[in-house]
Amino acid sequence: MIISENKPINEILGFLKNVEKVVLIGCNQCAAICKSGGEEEVLKMKEALEIEGKTVLGYRILDPACNLLKSKKDLKELKSELADADAVLSLACGDGTQTIVKNLKNIPVYPANNTMFIGETKRIGEFEEACKACGDCELGWTGGICPVTMCAKGLINGACGGAKNGKCEVSQDNDCAWVKIYERLKDIDQLDNLLEIRPMKDYSKPVSYTHLRAHETLSDL
């Protein structure tokens, strides 16, 4: 899930300083779960903007905002409002906001949210980072625990030696990723995975459009 949070209202108003009429767009999936862009949050934003003298012509909660074709269809329901608006304010994640931009060629689209990370819900209102979308997943040999995300140093070949009582030396609030990986591999009888020396992570590897079309290649097999 994409974790996002609302930008400070002053930053949002800065985007809209020359805007009188605005349309609001939310997302019924990740942003709704994060309480940053569901219908409730869109209505709160509407109220906040109207207090500041803005005219909100309408709103739509996309499901989801990041589906290019579906969003294009759903946004047609706001055709008249969009034609009269000075700008669109997106309460979706960065991906959803860019999807909206692709569907609305002739009107500015501004973000109301900051996209934080890919993560999971620990409990209501509390989220934990789980993936950095590095494009070269390591989970297959680490027991499903990500060293790139969980290790503060992003180490690939085991712990740094600074962990104490299972906690990271960078922050005692965090578990040592490699202790967790060791324990997991022990549980599933795959400790031999730690004997192989892994190459340094290649962060120059581009995540290109080719990756996004991989499903088409697989469907041709």
Short names for language-model regions:
Residues 194-203:
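Long, compositionally biased charged/polar accessory segments in the mid-to-C-terminal portions
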Residues 210-217:
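Conserved small/polar residues in nucleotide/adenosyl-binding loops
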